[in-house]
Amino acid sequence: MLAVVKIDGEKVRRARERAFLSKGELAERAGLDRNTIGRIENAGATEVHPRTIRKLANALCVDPASLTPQE
């Protein structure tokens, strides 16, 4: 079974905008596809591989927990 974690797309978008990055710039920094960034941001809360949330958090210089939904 593949491990997944929830990510909050709105929090990703806000963190990206605070860092003054475009979706393409974030994708390049995180080593992800620009379409993946768009899907995450538009999905609200969605499930991703733990590696994806770590890549995004590192690229945004934030704690991975700050990108997860409050439960």
Regions from the language model: what does each represent?
Residues 1-18, 65:
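A short, Lys/Arg-rich alpha-helix, primarily the initiator
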Residues 10-29, 54-55:
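Short basic helix-loop element that most often maps to the first helix and adjoining turn
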Residues 12, 26-27, 37-40, 67:
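Conserved hydrophobic/aromatic packing and binding residues within compact polymer-binding modules
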Residues 20, 44-58:
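Short, basic-rich loop-to-helix N-cap that marks the start of a DNA-contacting helix
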Residues 32-47:
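Recognition helix of helix-turn-helix/homeodomain-like DNA-binding domains
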Residues 41, 52, 71:
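DNA major-groove recognition helix of helix-turn-helix
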Residues 61-71:
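Short C-terminal boundary/hinge segments that cap the last helix of small helical domains
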